[in-house]
C-alpha cells in the first residue's frame, strides 16, 4: 500500500477511477500494493488529478501501525469527502508478499468499502503485483509492475479491469529519502480511451521509527 504509492497511502495502493480503488501514497499510480508502510512512518501527500479519475484535489495520510498493519485517510475537496482504507500483511517475507484490506470507504458519500486481496513478488529491482478487488456487485482484476533503477527512480505500470478504471504509466522520483513525486498518465478502459493526468507529492515523517530516520540521514550525508 506504499507509494507510492498509499498511497498514501491506500492515513497509497493510485490507490482509483470513478470511485474504484485509490492508490496509496507509496504504491503505484492507481492500485494498492502489497508492501506495507513501515511501523511508525506517517506519509502525507497532496494529489492532483483529472476529474474523470476522481476527486481533483486530495490530501492523503498513511500511517504504519505495526509491521503487519497500516491505515489510510484521503480528504477530497470536490466533492467534500473523507475516504478510508486499511491493509494487513498476511505474508511479508520478501520477495513474497500477500496482503488484504479495503479501500474507498466513504461514509459521507455512502460508498461501501471495497475489499481486496493482493500477492506480490518484491525483488531489488522488479516488483510484480497480482490481485482482485470487489467493487459493488463485481470483482475486478488488479495487475501491476514496477522497475526500480536505483533508490531515486522507478518506472511503473498498472491496470485495473472494469468500467471506470484505467491502465497507467508513471514514474516515481525520490527527490530525497523522505520526499517523492509520482506523475502518471491514465488511459481509460472505457472508449474513447481518454488520456488523463495525475501527480502526487509525498513527504514521510518517522514518528516512532527513529532508527530508519537516522539511516536516511546517514545515506543523505554520503
Which ranges hold each PLM region?
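Positively charged n-region of N-terminal signal peptides that target proteins for export
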Residues: 1-4
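Surface loop/turn motifs at the tips and blade-to-blade linkers of beta-strand repeat domains
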Residues: 134-136
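General zinc-binding finger modules coordinated by cysteine/histidine
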Residues: 139-144
Amino acid at each position: 500500500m506504499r507509494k507510492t504509492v498509499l498511497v498514501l497511502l491506500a492515513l497509497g495502493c493510485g490507490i482509483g477511477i470513478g470511485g474504484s480503488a485509490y492508490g496509496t501514497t507509496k504504491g503505484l499510480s492507481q492500485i494498492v500494493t502489497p508492501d506495507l508502510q513501515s511501523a511508525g512512518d506517517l506519509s502525507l501527500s497532496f494529489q492532483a488529478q483529472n476529474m474523470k479519475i476522481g476527486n481533483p484535489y486530495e490530501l492523503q495520510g498513511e500511517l504504519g501501525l505495526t509491521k503487519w498493519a497500516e491505515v489510510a485517510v484521503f480528504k477530497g475537496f470536490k466533492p467534500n469527502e473523507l475516504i478510508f482504507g486499511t491493509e494487513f500483511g498476511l505474508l511479508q517475507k520478501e520477495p513474497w508478499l500477500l496482503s488484504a484490506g479495503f479501500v474507498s470507504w466513504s461514509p459521507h458519500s455512502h460508498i461501501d468499502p471495497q475489499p481486496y486481496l493482493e500477492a506480490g513478488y518484491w525483488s531489488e529491482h522488479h516488483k510484480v503485483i497480482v490481485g482482485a478487488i470487489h467493487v459493488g456487485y463485481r470483482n475486478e482484476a488488479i495487475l501491476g509492475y514496477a522497475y526500480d533503477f536505483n533508490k531515486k527512480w522507478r518506472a511503473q505500470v498498472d491496470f485495473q479491469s472494469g468500467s471506470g478504471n484505467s491502465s497507467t504509466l508513471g514514474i516515481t522520483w525520490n527527490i530525497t529519502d523522505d520526499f517523492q513525486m509520482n506523475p502518471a498518465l491514465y488511459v481509460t478502459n472505457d472508449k474513447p480511451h481518454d488520456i488523463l493526468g495525475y501527480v502526487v507529492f509525498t513527504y514521510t515523517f518517522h514518528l516512532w521509527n527513529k532508527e530508519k530516520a537516522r539511516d536516511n540521514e546517514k545515506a543523505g550525508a554520503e
